[in-house]
Swiss-Prot record:
Protein purpose: RNaseP catalyzes the removal of the 5'-leader sequence from pre-tRNA to produce the mature 5'-terminus. It can also cleave other RNA substrates such as 4.5S RNA. The protein component plays an auxiliary but essential role in vivo by binding to the 5'-leader sequence and broadening the substrate specificity of the ribozyme.
GO CC term, one of those recorded: ribonuclease P complex
Domain of life: Bacteria
Family of this protein: Belongs to the RnpA family.
Catalytic activity: Endonucleolytic cleavage of RNA, removing 5'-extranucleotides from tRNA precursor
GO molecular function: 3'-tRNA processing endoribonuclease activity; ribonuclease P activity; tRNA binding
PROSITE patterns linked: RIBONUCLEASE_P
Protein name: Ribonuclease P protein component
Subunit (UniProt): Consists of a catalytic RNA component (M1 or rnpB) and a protein subunit.
Keyword Transferase applies: no
Pfam families: Ribonuclease_P (PF00825)
């Protein structure tokens, strides 16, 4: 198993983010929202992260949230389909609620309709 998180697993360019947002395939929970593409033409998934200053004013808080999401992706990327994902943090979470954020991320990424995720058009 490969647990690295190299550049090939990241969405880096504005066009990559725009193409994912153009599909308008979004699901959200209390803390997170995940947008996904139909496919990326590669043999592995890629992820992009959006954590705005409205969510958390301090950079160390935003970095912590991104680190939690990246770590979850790094450990689970082999189980995900070859799609592009953009994860947007809707509400701030910290060490106390990081477990809830990981659980929500799993529900949103694996796309189980029985999880009660809200689908947005």
């Amino acid at each position: 198993m490969d647990y690295r998180f190299g550049r090939q697993y990241r969405l880096l360019k504005t066009d990559d983010f725009s193409s994912v947002f153009a599909f308008r395939n979004r699901r959200s929970r209390d803390l997170l929202q995940v947008s996904r593409s139909n496919g990326n033409g590669l043999d592995h998934p890629r992820i992009g992260l959006v954590v705005g200053k409205k969510t958390a004013k301090r950079a160390n808080e935003r970095n912590y949230m991104k680190r939690v999401i990246r770590d979850w992706f790094r450990l689970n990327k082999n189980r995900l389909p070859p799609q592009d994902f953009v994860v947007r943090v809707r509400r701030k979470f910290d060490r106390a609620t990081a477990k809830q954020a990981r659980a929500e991320l799993a529900q949103l990424m694996f796309g189980n309709p029985a999880t009660g995720c809200r689908k947005q058009a």
